[in-house]
Amino acid sequence: MVKYTKSENLLSIVKKIILKRDKFLNLANKIPTPFYVYDKEGMDESIESFVASFQRHIPNFQSYYAVKLNHHPLIVSRAVEKGMGLDVASIRELNIALKAGAEKIVYYSPAKSGNDLKYVLKHADKVRIHIDSFNELHLLGKLTSKLKIKIEVGIRIHTPAHGLWTKYGIPLQSLRKFWEEASKYPFLKLNGIHFHQSRNKTVSFYVNTIRDLANYLKENFTSDQLKSVALVDFGGGFEHCESEGVIVRKGLHWPKYKISKNITIEEYARAIGNSIKKCFDPIINATYLSEPGRYICNNAMHIVLSVADIKDKENCILNGGVNMVGWQRFEKEYFPLVNITHPSKKERQCRMWGN
């Protein structure tokens, strides 16, 4: 069940923006609004808190930034500089990752073509592929044998509890069969298992999937197969952002804002770490990988807008709008606008219409 908190609890976020007020205003004096601001400090804080929490509870842990969330060169390069690997979902994203100097790359998408796989194999020294299906396994296996190129791979799995997310990967019950099929291809080194679901407001997805996967491995894998499991990727989907929520509209009345009350990244890490110790440690010796996206880049970018016109005390026109984000996120979710020329710690009602 989703929990909500009061909008007053956004004050900590507002205070952080106000502390950076002079930097924003200096930029606005030099560059016409609207524009985007890359916040290196904000990104560093997110990376450091994420990595510290998970390494505290999972010593053999690696983090990979999900490039699809924001592929701006400054974001991607900084993730690499801070020691993260990169998770890519297309050849375009792979090229961005290579240009950023990434040495650790995971390539996963459910619709890889033969040409995609050939291109990835050229960079097999830096990239591991997470396979989505038996058909893809056979396609990649034949390509590696033909080209005589070795590459490390994993397979994405799902359980019935994953709902619509069962469109990705293979059923958990097919995992041993997949492992046996992969052994037919000498240039494929299958050593990883991958699962993911977005927007997990609680830890139950991770805890339950780890439990189910561990039980399956114990009951179905041979001792040699268990020894070959060197990596488990539990994806991302951490619902952490303190400013997110929903807009509740009732007729012509002012909308109500319900701010999501989410658990902390430390709580995610602790629960996942405890599940790994309980379920995986007795049967496999693996490295654990996660692919955070929004957690890393959410506070790394801001949009600076100006008021173009004031219609009345309740309505004004801005010189930019939701098109600057790329989708209608602000129509369904709540994010605070902070007045940096006349800052206040009190929230006020005003309709801010986009250009």
Please report, for each region that a protein language model flagged, where it lies by residue.
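A charged N-terminal "starter" segment
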Residues: 1-151, 184-185, 189, 222-225
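Active-site loop/helix belt of alpha/beta enzymes
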Residues: 2, 159-306
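Active-site beta-loop-alpha junctions enriched in small/polar residues
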Residues: 41-42, 66-72, 91-92, 110-112, ...
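Charged (often Lys/Glu-rich) extended helix/loop segments that serve as interaction or gating elements
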Residues: 48, 271-277, 281-355
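Short, solvent-exposed amphipathic alpha-helical segments in soluble enzyme
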Residues: 80-81, 144-147, 170, 304-306, ...
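Structured core elements
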Residues: 85, 106, 128-130, 154-156, ...
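Short helix/loop capping segments that flank catalytic or ligand/cofactor-binding pockets
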Residues: 97, 139, 242, 298, ...
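A generic local secondary-structure boundary/capping motif
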Residues: 141-145, 167, 340-341
